Amino acid sequence: PDPCCNDKCDCKEGECKTGCKCTSCRCPPCEQCSSGCKCANKEDCRKTCSKPCSCCP
């Protein structure tokens, strides 16, 4: 089985903790986009940018 993160996920920088694999691991939505993301709003930014901020869903 995949290491840890099966029932409880520890999110870090938008992904599961190092060494963990978990499809349900999601961090809180970003508050704002980074300078590298040219989107109208944070919803579009989350959809189109690979990693607009420190913690993305």
From Swiss-Prot:
Family matches, as InterPro entries: Metalthion_crustacean, Metalthion_dom_sf
Function of the protein: Metallothioneins have a high content of cysteine residues that bind various heavy metals. Class I MTS in marine crustacea are involved in the sequestration of elevated levels of heavy-metal ions.
Lineage, highest ranks first: Eukaryota, Metazoa, Ecdysozoa, Arthropoda, Crustacea
Positions contributing to a divalent metal cation 1 binding: 4-5, 16, 20
Residues bound to a divalent metal cation 3: 11, 16, 25, 27
Protein name as catalogued: Metallothionein-2
Residues noted as binding a divalent metal cation 5 in the record, renumbered to the chain: 33, 37, 55-56
Binding residue positions for a divalent metal cation 6: 39, 45, 49, 56
Keyword tags: Metal-binding, Metal-thiolate cluster
Sequence similarity: Belongs to the metallothionein superfamily. Type 3 family.
Cysteine pairs bridged by disulfides in the record: none
Gene Ontology MF annotations: metal ion binding
Binding site for a divalent metal cation 4: 30, 33, 49, 53
Segments for region (Alpha): 29-57
Stretches for region Beta: 1-28
Residues that hold a divalent metal cation 2 according to the record: 5, 9, 22, 25
